[in-house]
């Protein structure tokens, strides 16, 4: 069962979203079906039935506590190695360790400033290892030491709290914060950003974001997923981001104890937060539903630099 009050509240919220966000759920399922068929073409005939069965089990949960158990059972039954989900688990682990880090690095490389880089929320370290191989001095941190063998040579410090950035002031030219902030609980978002600003002159932040329809859409204009997403009411866009995140982490990967902070924001909300703490927005790029991602969401990359007058603020 969910062990903390925060986790119980998060699962109740996700349960409500699943039960009442029918439009968002339909969008999420069609997004996943299209993506899984594209990434796992050998098994495309299994995909729709698997998603429908998974969804039926999740919707049968009567409350957040039951949804927590259902997510674990659905993962084991349909997505884990050794069972009916071997097709998914083998393909996904290859993607996560090989293709995904290369794509992620390509999406960030042009924005990295200087030579020292912090990968904040580094996980297994696949991306950090590539950053190191590209000639940067790459440092890592996360709430737990999840590093795989390719990243064990990189400096790592474990975070002592959800807002801790355990490195010295001004230590980095750039910090990469990839789809981390929406997993942070609301009271921690600004303290964490202030700590990141303390250690790095530039932050390269990628977030699952909604309310992007008034942004200039260059390369993304022909993404059918983004067109469909932008037609949804903003409240439904938010629900879809919640469901995509829950499905991609708890259901597909079995990460049922992940902190689902659900801090999804509009582009203009992120801009106001950055401005309020002395971070100047250098670039905002709507990447949208990147075709290379298995679990796609509407992603926006923000490049923000510290206003030098605010170092000690």
Question: Where does each model-flagged region fall?
Answer:
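N-terminal accessory regions of S-adenosyl-L-methionine
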Residues: 1-104, 113, 217-241, 252-257, ...
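A short, conserved alpha-helix within the catalytic core of class I
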Residues: 184-195
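C-terminal alpha-helical "lid/dimerization" subdomain adjacent to the S-adenosyl-L-methionine
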Residues: 208-277, 282-292
């Amino acid at each position: 069962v969910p062990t903390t009050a925060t986790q119980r509240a998060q699962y109740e919220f996700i349960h409500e979203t699943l039960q009442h966000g029918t439009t968002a759920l339909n969008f999420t399922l069609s997004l996943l079906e299209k993506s899984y068929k594209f990434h796992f073409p050998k098994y495309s005939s299994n995909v729709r039935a698997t998603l429908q069965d998974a969804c039926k089990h999740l919707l049968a949960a009567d409350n957040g506590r039951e949804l927590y158990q259902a997510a674990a059972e659905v993962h084991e039954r349909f997505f884990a190695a050794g069972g009916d989900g071997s097709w998914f688990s083998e393909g996904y682990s290859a993607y996560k360790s090989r293709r995904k880090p290369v794509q992620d690095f390509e999406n960030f490389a042009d924005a990295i400033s200087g030579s020292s880089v912090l990968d904040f929320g580094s996980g297994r370290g696949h991306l950090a290892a590539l950053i190191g191989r590209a000639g940067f001095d790459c440092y890592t941190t996360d709430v737990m030491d999840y590093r795989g063998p390719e990243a064990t040579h990189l400096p790592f410090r474990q975070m002592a709290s959800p807002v801790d950035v355990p490195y010295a002031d001004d230590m980095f030219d750039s910090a990469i914060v990839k789809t981390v902030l929406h997993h942070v609980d609301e009271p921690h978002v600004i303290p964490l950003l202030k700590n990141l600003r303390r250690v790095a002159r530039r932050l390269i932040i990628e977030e699952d974001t909604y309310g992007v329809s008034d942004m200039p859409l260059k390369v993304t204009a022909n993404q059918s997923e983004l067109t469909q997403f932008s037609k949804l009411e903003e409240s439904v866009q938010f629900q879809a981001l919640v469901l995509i995140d829950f499905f991609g982490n708890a259901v597909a990967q079995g990460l049922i104890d992940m902190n689902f902070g659900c801090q999804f924001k509009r582009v203009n909300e992120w801009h106001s937060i950055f401005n309020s703490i002395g971070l100047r927005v250098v670039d905002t790029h709507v990447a949208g539903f990147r075709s290379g991602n298995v679990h796609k969401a509407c992603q926006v990359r923000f490049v923000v630099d510290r206003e030098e007058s605010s170092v000690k603020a």
